[in-house]
Amino acid sequence: MRIGYGFDSHEFRAGIPLKIGGVELPHAKGLGGHSDGDVLLHAITDALLGAIAAPDIGVLFPPSDPKWKGADSAVFLREALDRVARSGYRVSNIDSSLILAAPKIGPHSADIRGRVAKLLGIDCSCVGLKAKTPEGLNLENAAVAHVVVLLEQTSLSTKIPASPKVREKRGTRTGNNAGPIKNKKKR
């Protein structure tokens, strides 16, 4: 099992649609960002990437790259899921918290959970979503998302990195000291 944590925040801006969890919500302002500004999908993506120790969303999809201007955040999520699968894991469940003053998420919660579940390929009962108001935190013009994801191995045949002692017995190392271990002469 692996656990990942993701966080994202965006400022509200006039003249753009509001997307949260892949669902367009009725609101006077949307969330600014280089892509579509979907704060929840961005946090989920980073949680998935973090769980497998992969580079974060900003490294894989840099805001400096015009290719990602206005991109659907589901593209980022699909790439993260592909990396998770290639690492031998799948999503077991996620839990998320949204912090924003408006709009109220309650009326849209089922739609958001359903869309996220579909994107992740899991049952809706495995997607937790809570919405909180910022109450005195001066966040009336922003939205924040926190996400925790639990991954499980897809099969027992998935390779798990050996412990340092096992690698030493095999005569190999990983990380900064990668390469074969030279036999030490006994004195």
Segments the model singles out, each with a brief description of its role:
Residues 1-112, 119-120:
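RNase III-family endoribonuclease catalytic core
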Residues 96-100, 129, 145-149:
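A structural signal for short, well-ordered beta-strand segments
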Residues 129-133, 141:
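Pyridoxal 5′-phosphate
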